[in-house]
Amino acid sequence: MSSNPTSSVREFEYKAEMKQLLNLIVHSLYTHPEIFLRELISNASDALGKARFRMLSSDEGLDKSGDLKITITVDKESGSFVIEDTGIGMSEEELISNLGTVASSGTLGFMEALKEQQKEGQRLDANLIGQFGVGFYSVFMVTDEVTVETKSIESGLQGWRWKSSGQGSYTIEPVEREARGTRISFILKEEFREFAQEYRVEQIIKKYSNFVEYPIYIGSRQINSMTALWQRPKSELKQEEVNEFYKFIANDFKDPLDYLHVSVEGAVSFKALLFIPSEAPMELLYNQGALEKRGPQLYVKKVLIQHECRDLLPEYLRFVSGVVDTEDLPLNVSRELVQASPVMAKIKQILTTKLLGWFDTIAKEEPEKFRAFYKAFGTILKIGLNTDFTNRDKLIDLLRFETTKTVEGEYVTLKEYVGRMAEGQTEIYYHSGSSRAQMLAHPNLEYFRKRDIEVLLLSDPVDVFVIPSIFEYDKKPLKSIEKAEIDMSTVEPEGERLSAEGTVGVISLFKEVLGERVADVVESRRLVSSPVTLVSGKDALDSQFEKMMKMMNKDADMPSTKKILEINTAHPIIRNLAGKHAVGLSTDPVVRAAVTQLFESALLLEGDLESVADYVSRMNELVEAATRS
């Protein structure tokens, strides 16, 4: 920061991330220049909402003069553009905080998401700018310099002027201003002079901001409808206006996947209009804490109280956008009172029940739509299994799984799985892995494939945290096929097995060579065509769970859990090794290398092989030995 103490005009330097942000906005979102107006109107609407809230909750020390409105003035000859609101305004400190810096999480989150889209070759999503709270800066796409004049709603405070070219700095100086609110003015660049024409501004307002709850004027003409759709009966709603309303409140360019209209009268009365987005918002993909901050808008008697109310829905449903309006809370309700209010708790309970019931109806009546919904939000929905025990059974019924008997992209419910279980099967089996292909190639499936037993395939990273917690469904326990505890004692081993003496001998060979690298070595009853496989002990972590924990705790240096190595004593390789051991060749380098290679091949299938170079080198040595004349 630099300033000149001899002048009332002070100059401030932007932080490095601000310069980077402004450069990204101007050069990455240039194909969507009209969004600058959407963002300026959105900010003005927020300022008006804050002003109305302050007026309703306090009678002292506030400038309450004038109507709450937004006015836009343009001149096509000069290219000038002015947008003014009568909202809460800003003090000097707020001006610096709001326009001179951006919360690093918002800035970095926006830049991260934008770069990710560019890297993946996706069409740039102009919706990003609103999701990450950096919308004001989109104005620098259409102008070279912006002037902001503002005065706080607090009586007796000085007005201020902020000016910047969006390069390396901005200036602030005192200004004479009578009315509260904020005025933003600039001259449009030559190539964007279309936005200085009233008809074009009107088009954009009706496209993006028609449902702003405060009047938007171009000169003396009001442009927007200000319709509270949620107050109207569902039978009167038209899909087109519902879609436009969703785009406005959700800051989205796409139509919603579906919407739910709720009207409740009773001990608690409220109306709601809730939406499922057509795809997961970018902020949920690139910001791990985004769900904690999201929620529908809360209105009391048609007055916006909270823009994103986290207390209306449980965290696993906060991908739902919308509006909830009740008359059972006071207008001056505080954040703390909202959290503690029994009214809010009841509304949350009712909305949760209605949403889960709605999802179930979609699943039964519109399976294709539910498939799209589950693809976008299934991972988030699963969070509720470990947090919402009241609705746990409803959530379990919404779960969908690929299996060893479905084609890719086809899903079954647990109810459907149980309905087609093999004769005599008493447990529900699942297998977790990084991909469908990786799981289907795993040796641990051989036993189940041979006996035509269906296995659930869990490739969603969150599955390893939530699915084991279900324990049982329809009185049938869920079991990981990776666990050694699966009872196969009644299963006759496949093929001609080694004698008891030969089995003991080859097991001792593996234990001697592998030593502390394994928890145990045992004869397998699950293998059919593979020589070895790795399984986890009864109380050991599932492999995928352990991997996820390591990824989440990279600095913790978590040791790997030792696995149990199962060997197939009917397999030719194991029988050959048993023969070598029987004639005293246990110390032969080729024999020992073969044992190590089998073990590390199992590690490779698990994705746990630490040194690929050593593995390849040893494989070359074995090939050389096998081809030696």
Swiss-Prot record:
Subunit structure as annotated in this protein's UniProt entry: Homodimer.
Gene3D superfamilies for this protein: 3.30.230.80, 3.40.50.11260, Heat shock protein 90, C-terminal domain, Histidine kinase-like ATPase, C-terminal domain
Predominant location: cytoplasm
Family per similarity comment: Belongs to the heat shock protein 90 family.
Function: Molecular chaperone. Has ATPase activity.
Region (A): 1-335
NCBIfam families membership: PRK05218.1
Family matches, as Pfam families: HATPase_c_3, HSP90
PANTHER family, per the entry: HEAT SHOCK PROTEIN 90 FAMILY MEMBER
Organism expressing this protein natively: Chlorobaculum tepidum (strain ATCC 49652 / DSM 12025 / NBRC 103806 / TLS) (Chlorobium tepidum)
Statement: the UniProt record of this protein carries the keyword Cell membrane: no
Keywords tagged on the record: ATP-binding, Chaperone, Cytoplasm, Nucleotide-binding, Stress response
InterPro entries in the cross-refs: HATPase_C_sf, HSP90_C, Hsp90_fam, Hsp90_N, Ribosomal_Su5_D2-typ_SF
Subcellular location(s) of the protein: Cytoplasm
GO MF annotations in UniProt: ATP binding; ATP hydrolysis activity; ATP-dependent protein folding chaperone; unfolded protein binding
Region of interest (B), residue spans: 336-547
Annotated region described as C, given as residue ranges: 548-629
Protein name (record): Chaperone protein HtpG
Domain of life: Bacteria
Any GO CC annotation of this UniProt entry: cytoplasm
Keyword Cytoplasm carried by entry: yes
